A protein has these predicted regions:
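N-terminal subdomain of lithium-sensitive/metallo-dependent phosphomonoesterases centered on the IMPase/IPPase/PAP
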Residues: 1-90
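DPxDG-like acidic metal-binding loop motif
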Residues: 75-138
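Short, intrinsically disordered, charge-balanced linker/junction segments flanking boundaries
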Residues: 141-144
Length: 144
């Protein structure tokens, strides 16, 4: 499952996130809770792509995305379900909007609210940090 999730993050990055990096129009950016709480079309599209693909990897799991939570707060009630994926499609949205390199895509998997695994894909570095509970962290790059 480690490689599959990393592959999904890479695919979302290559097709939905990086084509918009340094190429956003004003219409591609919106605010959520305040003028500094930004969301972009890349955030929304990547989350829409990732959610069903992650759920398909683990039967009965539920994907809880940052953007869906900001629009439908009641889905937070599912955070303690048996298997829950959490998705932040573009962490560091302000940096993404500014065109700087300091942003990433993050996914985690929790079992009854306890984190089990986490993935941080850095599109500008083309690598993925993968953490597993009680087993440490590995770095996968597109080169290996």
């Amino acid at each position: 499952m480690r490689a599959e999730v990393a592959g999904l993050l890479k695919q979302a990055s290559e097709t939905l996130i990086m084509p918009r990096w340094r190429a956003l129009d004003d219409a591609d950016i919106a605010t959520k809770t305040s003028e500094t709480d930004l969301v972009t079309i890349a955030d929304r599209e990547a989350e829409i792509f990732l959610s069903p693909h992650l759920e398909a990897l683990l039967a009965g799991s539920f994907a809880l995305g940052e953007e869906a939570c900001s629009e439908q707060g009641d889905i937070l009630n599912r955070a303690e379900d048996e298997w829950v994926w959490t998705i932040d499609p573009v962490d560091g949205t302000k940096n993404f909007v500014k065109g700087t390199r300091q942003f990433c895509s993050m996914v985690s998997l929790a079992h009854y609210g306890t984190p089990v695994m986490a993935w941080i894909y850095r599109p500008t570095e083309k690598d993925c940090l993968i953490a597993t509970a009680n087993a440490g962290v590995v770095l996968m790059s597109d080169d290996n």
